[in-house]
Amino acid sequence: MKPEYTSDELLPLSGLQHFCFCRRQWALIHIERQWQENVLTVEGKLLHNRVDNPFFSETRNGVITARSVPVASYRLGLSGVCDVVEFTSSTEGVRLPGREGTFSPAPVEYKRGKEKQDHSDEVQLCAQALCLEEMLSISIPVGSFYYHEIRHRVELELTRQLRDLVGEIALEMHAYFQRGHTPRVKPSKACRSCSLEDVCLPALQDQVIPASKYIQQQIEDG
C-alpha cells in the first residue's frame, strides 16, 4: 500500500459504501459528480441530521459521546465524519481535553434500515475506526451500528480480514479516481433502488461500444 497520501488526495470515506454497493455508482458520484435523491437517500439524510450536531458531546453512564467527529487517514487516503464516537474509561485509552483519566474510543454508525446482506456497512465502520486509530495512535477492536428501523444496536469486531479489505478497496478507489475512469457493471436487482438509475441507464450498457470500435465500424461501412 502507498505509505501516505497528501491532503489533496484524500477521498470521501462515505464513498466506501457507494463503492461496495456498485463501483459504477461510486464513480458517477465521486468522479463525474452526479447525484440523484430517492426515498432511501432522503430518509437516510433525515436520520443523520438528527444525529449530527457538530462539536456536541454528552456523558451518560460514564461514556462520553461525541457527535459529528471529523476523521482522516493519510495511509488509506480517506477523510470523513463519524456519526458518533463513544469514549469509555480505560487504563489503556487516550487523554481527552478537559477530562480526567484516559478513554478508549469506538465509532458508532447510525443506519436508516436494518442490517445489510453485503459488507458495505462493515467496511465503512471499519474505515472510521482505522482513521481514529491513526489519529489517536490507539487500537480499536470493535465498533457498533444502530439500526433506526428496528431500534437495534449491533457490535462489529474489526478483524484483520476486514481491515485488509478496507485497504484493498481504498487502493482500488484511488486507482479509478486517478484514471478518471467510470467502470461498466452488469445490471442487477440492486439497480432498482439506486438513486442514479436514471443517470446510469444500466439497461443500455450492453449496447454501448468503445469509440475506437465505433470508428472502425464506420470506416468499414463507408
Residue spans of the language-model regions?
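A short hydrophobic/aromatic micro-motif that marks alpha-helical segments and, especially, helix-coil
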Residues: 37-39, 176-177, 212
